[in-house]
Amino acid sequence: MWHLLPPSALLLLISSVTKAADPSKAVVLLDPPWVRVLTDDNVTLTCQGAYPPENNNTRWFHNGTHIVGSQAPSYLISGIKVENSGKYQCQTDLSPLSDSVQLQVHADWLVLQTSKWVFQKGESIRLRCHSWKNKRLYKVTYLQNGKPKKFFHNNSEFHIPEATVNHTGSYYCRGLIGHNNKSSGIVAITFQADFAGPSIAPLFPLWQQIAFCLMMGLLFAVDTGLYFFVRRDLRRSMVHKEEYNFKWSQAQDK
């Protein structure tokens, strides 16, 4: 019955079923969750994905190159260096290659840390003024576009509960390490207003989605088959009618 489907419809059906059957991509998580760190920090990357039973084999990639020798779900970078900067991805036996996570490593006294670069409307923003080797930092000021936004006598995170377009801009922090006044580099925080809606979990399990696609394909095939069957019989009827009319016309002429 599948041969009754037009090629374009068959390809569309196969594509929809394939997409429904594909598992979710793997996801790279950072611990601590900051995408900007200082040299000598410790960073753990964890691959969140689907694994077959008793097999947690994980493939890690740095700037598109496979990291040989790292097969565990967690990848620890101890005493991180500037050359460790770049894009990280992971893949499991049951999950496709993850989207990349951009990690920046800076050699400086201070770094303004953020968990991501682009925020959606209503999301919370966490900014952290981090010192090299966690040296004591006090009298910390967070600035947006050169203007002070928050001051802490003792170092603390700057938390924005709900992001809006007004929070777009260039941020940095400054504070005292000992008697020395230090400033971080600038971080550009951008805002995506209603560009993409929140992710919504599927209403039905995967097997029900696949069964639905197959059922719809079967119904479409039956409908298409009936269409061609009726059209063929209609053509035959028209031919017989024309032949009958022709013979009847000849009989009248005689």
Curated annotation (Swiss-Prot):
Q: Where in the cell is the protein located?
A: Cell membrane
Disulfide-bond pairs as recorded: 47-90, 129-173
Instruction: Show which residues sit on the Extracellular side of the membrane.
Output: 21-209
Q: Which residues cross the membrane?
A: 210-230
Q: Which ranges sit in the Cytoplasmic compartment?
A: 231-254
Instruction: Report the membrane topology from the UniProt record.
Output: Single-pass type I membrane protein
Give a GO biological-process term: antibody-dependent cellular cytotoxicity
Q: Does the keyword Repeat apply?
A: yes
Q: Mind telling me how this protein is modified after translation?
A: N-glycosylated.
Spell out the InterPro entries in the cross-references.
Answer: Ig-like_dom, Ig-like_dom_sf, Ig-like_fold, Ig_Fc_receptor, Ig_sub, Ig_sub2
Q: Which residues form the Ig-like C2-type domain?
A: 23-104, 121-174
What other facts are recorded?
Exhibits stronger binding to afucosylated IgG than to the wild-type fucosylated form.
Q: What is this protein called?
A: Low affinity immunoglobulin gamma Fc region receptor III-A
Q: Which organism is it from?
A: Cavia porcellus (Guinea pig)
Q: What is the lineage of its organism?
A: Eukaryota, Metazoa, Chordata, Craniata, Vertebrata
Underlying gene = Fcgr3a
